[in-house]
């Protein structure tokens, strides 16, 4: 009996432990632009599959892209007045009219931009991009002008910033010693100081002359005193 129990324990240990299923990693959320671009690309591919006669992406041209844009007009929500409508050219008509709804020019322009990027991201050469064809650009320009006149909403072009002409950089200010005004001020100050010094020397020499004259006029005693005082340092030097 004990041996049978040991075999049961061995079988229990041999059974693999059931592992929990790995947690599903959350899918990376696409941005709003990327999601819209993917939807637009799938819509265009579906349009090519339903096209009669069948049309492949390699044979798609700018004319087919324009045909696709006209096909989308039936799903538009923008009122575009006809030339014979009484509200033609009025941005806010007072009453409804039987004019059809169309895709707004701004929506078509943004759509072409997304499809143009999606075409190149799918591995196709930019040179063969039908969404970048000149005919598509001309068609979008015509739609823009026609809707602007019909809706009475002028299209304002974005003003491009004009490249300012490169002007030479301003020269740095000269140091004080090189500035004409400062040099003139220093020159005038130096001249004034020199004139004051000359005047002081002149007054000193005049005073000395006056003193000498007064001593000379005082008689021989003063002369002897001056001579003695002058000779005194000589005697002291000899000692």
UniProtKB/Swiss-Prot annotation:
Q: Which InterPro entries match?
A: ALOG, ALOG_dom
For bias kind Pro residues, which ranges apply? 167-178
Instruction: Kindly list the places in or outside the cell where this protein is found, as annotated in its UniProt entry.
Output: Nucleus
Q: Bias regions of kind Low complexity — which residues? A: 9-29, 179-215, 223-239
Enumerate the residue ranges of region (Disordered): 1-35, 149-239
Gene Ontology molecular function: any one: DNA binding
Motif Nuclear localization signal covers 157-161
Please give the coiled-coil regions recorded for this protein: none
- Spell out the GO cellular component terms annotated for this protein, sorted alphabetically and separated by semicolons: nucleus
- Return the PROSITE patterns for the record: ALOG
Q: Where is the ALOG domain?
A: 32-159
The entry sums up its family as follows:
Belongs to the plant homeotic and developmental regulators ALOG protein family.
What the protein does comes down to:
Probable transcription regulator that acts as a developmental regulator by promoting cell growth in response to light.
Q: By what name is this protein known?
A: Protein G1-like8
